[in-house]
Amino acid sequence: MKLLIDVGNTSLKAKLWQNEQVQACDLNNLPWHAITHVIYACVGRSELLNAILAQAAFNSISCFEAKVTKTLGGLTCAYEHFNNLGIDRWLALIASFTLYPNKACIVVDAGTATTIDVLNCDGQHLGGWILPGLDLMTRSLTQNTQRVFDDENTPFTNQLGINTPNGLKNGALVATIGAINQAKPYLNDKNTQIIFAGGYGSLLQQQFKESIFDPMLVIKGLNYWYELDENSNKL
């Protein structure tokens, strides 16, 4: 059994991996007797992660931090300075590459930031974009303009706004939808799979036919990263 930990900008997500399945866990009552590996990735800092790693060390459990590399198991990073690619983006790409082999993918992780990455059917990452997340996009306008205001009860939709709050929120949503659509010509592939993850992934997925929302995409990527990294070290 593996303990998989994803430390994002605003939260820590932890799951157990056993029998090729993601399982829920209670961080206050982890089954240390059954855990063989801890695999983690950090975008932000976390005192909770440090405490978990200390517990793992106390139980003599090996810990592995996921890192970005130029290549991994047939997947190639587009960045010349690959260390500058966020590990969460790399893990989402690894998961998409593994789950949808030989398929072109647009991978969207919609959290504090919205990242859009383009992957061709040969496993070549073509690059991507980093946008403000929907909340950050709307907040930046309300904080930096005098007459634009928000309403927390107003939902995000793709309709024209008929008042300031839904003009603001709908504008943020359609801007993000437009950015995702702009990625399609880079692949020129009618069978492109669009995959969404993150807090607003489900909302965005509803705007694209035959797309997929996978809330565990980055967590799955952690497991696949470990497996691919282990295999590459054996060669």
Swiss-Prot record:
The active site is at D88. K(+) binds at D109. The keyword Cell cycle does not apply. SUPFAM superfamilies: Actin-like ATPase domain. Its EC number is 2.7.1.33. Disulfide bonds: none annotated. This is Type III pantothenate kinase. It comes from Pseudoalteromonas translucida (strain TAC 125).
